[in-house]
C-alpha cells in the first residue's frame, strides 16, 4: 500500500532533509541520517516523478522495495519484524507490487510530522490491515484494506505520526486494539524518531 501523497507530499519531502532515525549505541542515542532518493538501500530502479497521462503526479517506484532496514516491534505480547519506510520514495511505494508478506512481518511508515493521514491500496496485491499510530507509539485506529482499491481510508485523528501495515487480520489474531502501545528493540518510537518543530 502507498500513502495518498496529496497533502502529505510537501511535508514528506522534509524527510529527505533531516536525520529522522536514531539508534542507540553505547547507551546513548546517535543520529542516523534518513535515506535520500540518492542514498536509499535499494538499487536505482525506474521511478515516476512526472505527471502521468491521467494527470496524476507519482513518486513511487515501479518495482517492490527491497533491502529496507528492519526493526523489531513489540505490541503487547506480540512481536513483529517491520521494514522501515522513511524516504519519500519509500513512503510513496510502501507495499506496492509485492505478492507475499511473512506472517509476523510488516512495514512501518515514519513521517517527520504529526497530521491526519489517508492510505489506499493502489498497486498493492496483499490484503493488509493498517494501524494509524500517534507520536508516542499508541495505536489510534485500525483498518482492513482491500487489495488494489484506490479508495482512501482517512484517519479520524489529526495526530498520526506512524502507520503500520501487516497481513490482514494479524492485529485481531494477536488481540491488538486501539490503545496498544508499540515499542521497539531499541526503545520507544518517539526516542528513535524524534519530532522536529517546524516554524
Q: What name fits each language-model region?
A:
Residues 1-9:
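Bacterial N-terminal signal peptides that target proteins for export
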Residues 22-199:
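Compact, glycine-rich, soluble single-domain proteins
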Residues 10-14:
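Hydrophobic helical h-region of N-terminal Sec-dependent signal peptides
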Residues 17-20:
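C-terminal motif of bacterial Sec signal peptides marking the signal peptidase cleavage site
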Amino acid at each position: 500500500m502507498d500513502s495518498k501523497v496529496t497533502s502529505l507530499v510537501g511535508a514528506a519531502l522534509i524527510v529527505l532533509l533531516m536525520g529522522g532515525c536514531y539508534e542507540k549505541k553505547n547507551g546513548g542515542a546517535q543520529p542516523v541520517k534518513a535515506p535520500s532518493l540518492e542514498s536509499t538501500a535499494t538499487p536505482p530502479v525506474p521511478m515516476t516523478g512526472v505527471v502521468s497521462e491521467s494527470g496524476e503526479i507519482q513518486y513511487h517506484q515501479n518495482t517492490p522495495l527491497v533491502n529496507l532496514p528492519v526493526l523489531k516491534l513489540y505490541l503487547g505480547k506480540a512481536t513483529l519484524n517491520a521494514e522501515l519506510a522513511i524516504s519519500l520514495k519509500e513512503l510513496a511505494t510502501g507495499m506496492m507490487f509485492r505478492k507475499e508478506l511473512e506472517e509476523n512481518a510488516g512495514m512501518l511508515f515514519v513521517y517527520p510530522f504529526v497530521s491526519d493521514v489517508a492510505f489506499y491500496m493502489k498497486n498493492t496485491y496483499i490484503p493488509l490491515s493498517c494501524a494509524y499510530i500517534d507520536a508516542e507509539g499508541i495505536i489510534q485506529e485500525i483498518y482492513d484494506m482491500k487489495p488494489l482499491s484506490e479508495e482512501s481510508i482517512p484517519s479520524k485523528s489529526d495526530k498520526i505520526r506512524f502507520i503500520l501495515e501487516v497481513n490482514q487480520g494479524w492485529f485481531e489474531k494477536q488481540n491488538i486494539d486501539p490503545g496498544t502501545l508499540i515499542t521497539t528493540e531499541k526503545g520507544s518510537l518517539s526516542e528513535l524518531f524524534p519530532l522536529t518543530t517546524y516554524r
